[in-house]
């Protein structure tokens, strides 16, 4: 059998040659050769190694680094169920075009179907949820196989970036001679693959009542479209993680405005990113009487209503004339009225609410800050916050919009962006990824502040059909799911500083200083009146 140490060295050398600079490792026995080579590469400053004991969290940490940095990031595990624990992060990476590189250690192929310990058929475990997968058995093939996987991960030729899987068969002995760890890695080269040309640009004609709908997108993309919409006087309906939600064109109450008369007059929608948050937007994107232009650099695109008229790499908005400026002013006037109503409602609502927490958190952050927002209610609460001239970089896992792995993702975003991160999460989201509060004493701690909106359960369900009075009897047990967990004790178990607040003033004080290390701010809110608040917000102005 090939030498396991040489194989591991070939894999790490090829990852480095292909531009990988961050690797997340979950320890194990079969992956020992990879772990030791990665440790040496980290020691020598060749890469940055992050060690976590929970594979699910490790996968989301790698996802966060890749999401914020735009570079491929590897996550390394041992064999067996360890690999399967990466599946949620792989799914999110697939649907959000994130270059996540799974490197799984495996037993030699001859041991499959023999009952050997921690041995299963894991080469194609992720099936259709990775862009490419291969098995590596020989160090001589490492640069070729890893190079092609990295091309698939970055979408350089396919224009479809996403996760890939390298399964590495490692035979005993698994621990190399210590002298090998001091030797330089082999010099390898991966094939240079230039990015596929992007050249389809559509120039949009004037005279059509146009809006831009911006969904989840990287900061550079969102900020570009915020500037374009402002220059063209086009109303901008931007979700928080679109990174377009700032400037004069963005409308903070757009999902409420879509329930009024303005929506009926829309003649064209330009879609950027991946919109997922609201039913009013979905209804708009499903209309057959509206010209729907989808702009994407990828080979897949957002079209949930199956109504797209054209999909292009880029679009040019027309120069604004009197008609365009009048159209924009109608939206701005409606926005001002809706904003005043929403703010008055929240200011007068008894007790602290999720939307109030969201607008307070946003107000505390500047354009150089980073915000990770959780799924469920937090991102929707942020979607009602006022729009300012600038905004922080906002990240979210909107590929599949799960609530798992978000603490780990926030930590990854901090490493990938190089900025302190504030994360706005629900209590159940924190509990889903509580293992991420456990960071070993040998691992550096990034500056991540977790603002946990604790309403003791799943309050988003109160705003949906099952939150109606007809379902009151089963609601708490099967939807509300109160847990009664002491978040202070949970944080203390991981050595994480904790602060509990119950008022807006206390929250503002807690947010006044930038994050230092990993810390938790628990914000206590009442879930009992969440449905009433949602109905009041959606009521006609």
Q: Each PLM stretch: what is its role?
A:
Residues 92-93, 103, 110-123, 381, ...:
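Thiamine diphosphate
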Residues 1-3, 283-377, 486, 495, ...:
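Phosphate/pyrophosphate-binding active-site segments
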Residues 63, 67, 78-79, 214-307, ...:
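Glycine-rich, anion-gripping cofactor-binding loops and their flanking helix/strand elements
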Residues 8-12, 29-35, 332-418:
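Active-site diphosphate/adenylate-binding microenvironment
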């Amino acid at each position: 059998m090939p030498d396991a140490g040489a194989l591991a060295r070939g894999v790490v050398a090829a990852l480095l040659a292909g531009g990988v600079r961050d690797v997340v490792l979950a320890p194990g026995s079969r992956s020992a050769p990879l772990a030791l080579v990665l440790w040496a590469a980290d020691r020598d400053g060749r890469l940055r190694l992050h060690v976590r004991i929970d594979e699910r969290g490790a996968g989301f940490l790698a996802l966060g680094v890749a999401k914020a940095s735009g570079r491929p990031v590897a996550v390394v595990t041992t064999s067996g169920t360890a690999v399967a624990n990466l599946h949620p992060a792989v799914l999110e990476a697939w649907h959000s075009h994130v270059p996540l590189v799974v490197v799984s250690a495996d037993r030699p192929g001859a041991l499959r179907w023999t009952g050997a310990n921690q041995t299963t058929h894991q080469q194609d475990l992720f099936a259709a949820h990775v862009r490419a997968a291969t098995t590596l058995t020989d160090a001589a093939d490492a640069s070729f196989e890893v190079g092609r996987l990295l091309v698939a991960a970055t979408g350089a030729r396919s224009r479809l970036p996403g996760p890939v899987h390298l399964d590495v068969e490692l035979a005993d002995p698994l621990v190399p001679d210590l002298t090998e760890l001091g030797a330089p890695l082999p010099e390898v080269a991966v094939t240079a693959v230039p990015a596929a040309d992007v050249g389809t640009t559509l120039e949009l004609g004037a005279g059509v009542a146009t809006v831009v709908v911006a969904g989840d997108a990287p900061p550079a993309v969102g900020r570009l479209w915020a500037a374009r919409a402002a220059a063209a006087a086009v109303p901008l309906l931007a979700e928080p993680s679109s990174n377009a939600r700032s400037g004069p064109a963005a409308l903070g109450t757009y999902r409420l405005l879509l329930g009024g008369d303005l929506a009926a007059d829309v003649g064209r929608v330009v879609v950027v990113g991946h919109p997922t948050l609201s039913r009013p937007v979905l209804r708009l994107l499903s209309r057959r009487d509206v010209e729907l232009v989808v702009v994407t650099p990828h080979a897949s695109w957002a079209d949930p209503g199956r109504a797209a008229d054209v999909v292009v790499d880029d679009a040019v908005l027309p120069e604004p004339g009197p008609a365009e400026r009048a159209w924009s002013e109608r939206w701005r006037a409606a926005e001002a009225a809706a904003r005043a109503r929403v703010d008055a409602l929240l200011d007068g609502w008894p007790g602290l609410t999720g939307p109030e927490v969201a607008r307070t958190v946003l107000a505390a952050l500047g354009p150089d800050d980073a915000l990770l927002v959780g799924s469920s209610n937090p991102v929707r609460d942020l979607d009602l916050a006022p729009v300012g001239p600038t905004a922080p970089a906002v990240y979210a896992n909107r590929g599949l919009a799960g609530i798992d792995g978000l603490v780990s993702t926030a930590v990854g975003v901090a490493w990938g962006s190089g900025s302190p991160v504030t994360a706005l999460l629900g209590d159940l989201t924190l509990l889903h990824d509580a293992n991420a509060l456990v960071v070993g004493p040998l691992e550096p701690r990034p500056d991540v502040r977790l603002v946990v909106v604790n309403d003791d359960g799943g309050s988003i369900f109160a705003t949906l059909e099952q939150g109606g009075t007809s379902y009151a009897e089963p609601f708490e047990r099967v939807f509300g799911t109160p847990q009664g967990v002491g978040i202070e004790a949970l944080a203390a178990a991981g050595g994480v500083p904790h602060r509990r607040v119950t008022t807006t003033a206390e929250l503002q004080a807690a947010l006044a200083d930038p994050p230092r290390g990993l810390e938790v701010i628990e914000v206590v809110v009442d879930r009992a009146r969440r449905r009433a608040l949602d109905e009041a917000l959606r009521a006609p102005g």
